[in-house]
Amino acid sequence: MPWYPWLKATVFALLAANAAVYAATGTASEALDSTAWLALLAAFEFETGFAGRFAGGRLAAVLRCVRLVAAAAILAAGIGYVLDGEWLDAANIGLWIVVVALLEFEVRYPAATARHRSQFKAAVATLYSGLAALVFAWLWQRDWFDAYDAALWLVAFATIELNLVGFGRGAVAGRGAG
């Protein structure tokens, strides 16, 4: 699909703009949260969106370091949300952490994921449903920017899921479409 790379680039640019807004006008937890997730998204995109070209070597080690630092920052932001009583944000981070853990498992162990595909799909559907419910909770609270940002993140991670099944430029090394 010729439009797919443009969709991913547009979503990434919008998320980068959101991170800038949170850095300029939000809390420290919001700034840390948005920039760390953006770094994690970029690392996942490199791993899943380029047909395994970055699966080995120096760049693979850099991507692992980026993921580790981003994960630590996300955990710190989550603690900040709990300490600030921002329960929707804390729940959002918790759900996304589990989504990322499942994505990591899917990238690292595709054969195991394939063997347990129905359970994996059910878990992912439950998590994404919870994340969608948070979008509606923010809308109900008239917190338009957080709702928009959360919806945009759902689109961003949907593109990673599409990468994993081979949509667009290619699948992860060792994975076929399907």
Q: Which role does the model predict for each range below?
A:
Residues 1-178:
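Polytopic alpha-helical membrane-helix bundles and their juxtamembrane interface segments
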